[in-house]
Amino acid sequence: MIKNNNMIYLEIHDTKDGLKTFNCGTKYDWYLIKKEKQNNNKTIIIDDKNNKIKMNISNMKYIPNNNIELYYKLFGDNNLVYDRCYTHSSTKKTVSKIENKEFKYKILHSTTQKGERYLYSNNNKDGLFDKSKIMFGDSGINNCVIDFEGKIGCSEHIICLKINSKKEGNKIKNILENKKFKDFINACSWSNYQINWKIFKSLKNFDEIKKILDI
């Protein structure tokens, strides 16, 4: 839609505006599009903080809810994330809440402010076992788990980023858990409030992210 037409105007609204407008706690946007070639035209945008900017969005894969000009600098062509894995989904019979002799393979299910929550599988096939990774829940980046040895699997609610060493894992963990990066992720939270794991398929590397956000 954006690439094939000229988006003249875009307004982004948060849940507070949703309550005022629709009596419903939902985010919403509205926009004005002209059926013509984009030709690198600039779009007037009012973000959900009521900031007004004018910029070319034709090459943007995602439009954050706010601070768009800054966050535009973070997007790149590095695929930092493993594809989402559903092998050990929490609803499957091969997964249990209780660890025992049969269900002995640890599965990370969530990372809350209070700590990690684990499930247990009766097998360690797929599920990103044997992959070096840093892991966190899709409901919020808290208490990231570094699994360089690949001993832990993941449920459907875990995002796993690629790492090459424990040192790199710790560096990425510090960036992920920094408030500035969390603000970026929150600005990219849309309909269901879950973190969109695909964002990590199109970012700059973490050294560049750290520099841009001044972490």
Segments and roles (model prediction):
Residues 1-95:
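Signature of N6-adenine DNA methyltransferases within the class I
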Residues 68-215:
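Polybasic, glycine- and aromatic-enriched phosphate-binding surface used to engage nucleic acids
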